[in-house]
Regions:
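N-terminal pre-catalytic "stem/leader" segment of glycosyltransferase-like enzymes
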Residues: 1-49, 324-326
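Extended catalytic core of nucleotide-activated donor transferases of GT-like folds
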Residues: 27-102, 194-195
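Acidic anion/phosphate-binding donor-loop and adjacent secondary structure
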Residues: 78-79, 116-134
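Conserved donor-binding/catalytic core segment of Leloir-type glycosyltransferases
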Residues: 129-148, 154-158, 168
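Nucleotide-activated donor-binding/catalytic signature segment of Leloir-type glycosyltransferases, i.e.
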Residues: 175-198, 205
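Aromatic "clamp/platform" in nucleotide-sugar-dependent glycosyltransferases that forms part
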Residues: 211
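A charged, aromatic-enriched C-terminal amphipathic alpha-helix characteristic of glycosyltransferases
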Residues: 266-277, 283-312
Length: 326
């Protein structure tokens, strides 16, 4: 059995890692909690104090430890070098991240293992009661994160003034979001998976306008349900989703320090006019369906399960010919 150690399940990384955990029938342990010795360990870590302090102790206690990390900018915080230096090989969920790490930290070995996003049918009865006669745009994520540009999505929605349309925001923040905006509905708090599946089923067009994404799990989930998905072309989303509604990005510098982001780092500058264009086109044509078989193939559980098992020499199965190893 593999033990997966990560942050709280309230976080995006926690939810990401837990999907691997469920795929392999492993145990999820939150950083700081105890676990049995001589186990195989899969970490999802960031280069911050609690992780950098804990990893040497975890390695001493365990049979084998592998580590995944993620990034969203052209250059990353120098402390990533400390994290990468603790392992002979680091795992990342995208080629975008792999290239960033290998360019900034020459000699780094990176293996790409894509995110696992299971496709589970939505509940038969709707949870939220979204009006069936409205066209509904939606977004799931930390809506107060500057990287997500959610206020620009709201601005686009208000500027378009589309009759019988709604914008639903599922906020995954640690604080309540209380914005009062006409036609914009905000859902706070941690929801069970069944409710999230219902949200995808009840809404129509997923909108992401991020300056960058290490993966973009909300958009990937929407694609699995064959929703029209608006994404940006900077970062990892195009590695998971092929959509005709892909917004072109220029480049811009970050203007202020925020967590691991530092002023002067570079990420995407998505085209606002394209956001308006794509939202209006989806609405005008009442686009409810977009085939995303390619996304399903990318996040296939059988392949990803085998790739993780190989990391720990479980049954010594060879990596499949489709495995993304670089």
């Amino acid at each position: 059995m593999v033990v997966f150690i990560g942050p709280t399940l309230l976080s995006g990384i926690g939810q990401f890692l837990n999907k691997y955990c469920e795929l392999l029938n492993g145990d999820y342990v939150q950083l700081g909690q105890d676990f049995l010795p001589n186990q195989d360990i899969f970490l999802f870590a960031l280069p911050i104090g609690p992780w950098l302090e804990a990893i040497p102790h975890i390695k001493k206690k365990s049979r084998k430890v592998v580590c995944m990390t993620i990034c969203e900018t052209e250059t990353v915080h120098p402390d990533y070098g400390k994290l990468l230096g603790l392992f002979d090989e680091i795992l990342t969920p995208s080629v975008f991240c792999q290239r960033v790490f290998q360019r900034q930290f020459p000699g780094t070995r990176c293996r790409v293992i894509l995110a696992h996003v299971p496709l589970v049918p939505p509940p038969k009865e709707p949870v939220f009661g979204v009006p069936s006669d409205h066209y509904v745009f939606y977004h799931i994520g930390n809506v107060i994160d500057q990287r997500k540009n959610v206020k620009k999505i709201i601005e686009a929605f208000l500027r378009l003034q589309l009759p019988k349309s709604l914008l639903v925001l599922k906020a995954t923040c640690h604080t309540q979001v209380t914005w009062k905006v006409p036609g914009v509905h905000i859902i706070n708090g941690l929801l069970p998976d069944e409710a999230i599946r219902s949200l995808h089923n009840e809404c129509h067009c997923y909108v992401s306008f991020s300056s960058s994404e290490g993966v973009g799990m909300g958009a990937v989930e929407a694609a699995l349900y064959n929703k029209p998905v608006i994404i940006t072309d900077y970062g990892a989303p195009p590695e998971y989703i092929k959509s005709r509604y892909t917004i072109e990005c220029g480049r811009q510098e970050i203007t202020q320090d925020d967590f691991l982001f530092q002023k002067g780092m570079v990420w995407g500058k998505p085209n606002f006019e394209q956001l308006l264009e794509f939202m209006k086109e989806a609405y005008d044509n009442r686009v409810y369906y977009q085939d995303h078989q390619w996304t399903r193939d990318q996040v296939d559980g059988n392949r990803i399960k085998n790739e993780i098992r190989v990391l720990f020499d479980v049954d010594k199965k060879p990596v499949s010919e489709n495995a993304l190893v670089f």
